[in-house]
Amino acid sequence: IENAHPGMFRVVSQRQTDLKQLVCDPTQLALWGMSPADTAQHVASEISPAQRASSISINYFAQQLLDVSKMSSAIELSGVYESVDLDGNPILLSGKVILPAKEPIKRYILVSHYTIASNAEAPSNIFSLEGLLVKLGYALIIPDYLGYGITADQVHPYLVMDITARNVLDMYDAVVPFMKAAGCVPEHDDIYLMGYSQGGATTMAVQHL
């Protein structure tokens, strides 16, 4: 985007991902704690109400998203945005935006990721399971957090909620004007917050900012 505001999200790399091909990749499924059998099971038959009631889990959530018959394509935008470090000094952080390739965007989901063990698992470096929500019309905003992505050389402030929440919200504030300038405006103004484990704590902290 020409003449982008300095505070906007800046794209470093972009690619289009075939979701159907992605969920049929055993290596990718393993990263999500899944297997090809999970995909085959969902495609073979609808999950019964009884299963639905007894399977409220991450795997059930994944099975709902792994219906390959309804998969389309997603656009992945990895980029950087301005935030602050632990001392309040300006810093560039990284993250990823995942949006439907062709369908209109319903609304944003701001995702705070769970605890990860290495930079290889940072959202900028993988396709997060939550990204499959694009098939339902959502655009995902997923920060790497300080200490991951382009700041992997720094110590991650694990469970220092105020700074992590600030970093997460700063990415949202940077992405929204970027998307508007690109002509990608959601149908609804309200956003969903999403997080699991460390991401759950971060999501609650974001609500207090």
Predicted regions and their residues:
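Short, surface-exposed "cap/lid" segments of acyl-processing enzymes
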Residues: 85-137, 144, 148-151
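Catalytic-loop region of hydrolases
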Residues: 1-104
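Second-shell loop/turn segments in exported
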Residues: 129, 153-161
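Gly/Ala-rich beta-loop-alpha elbow adjacent to hydrolase catalytic centers
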Residues: 195-199, 203
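Alpha/beta-hydrolase active-site loop
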Residues: 158-181, 208
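Stable alpha-helical elements in mature extracytoplasmic
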Residues: 108, 129, 164-171, 202-206
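Residue in the alpha/beta-hydrolase core beta-strand immediately N-terminal to the catalytic nucleophile
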Residues: 190-192
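Secondary-structure boundary elements
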Residues: 102, 137, 173-185
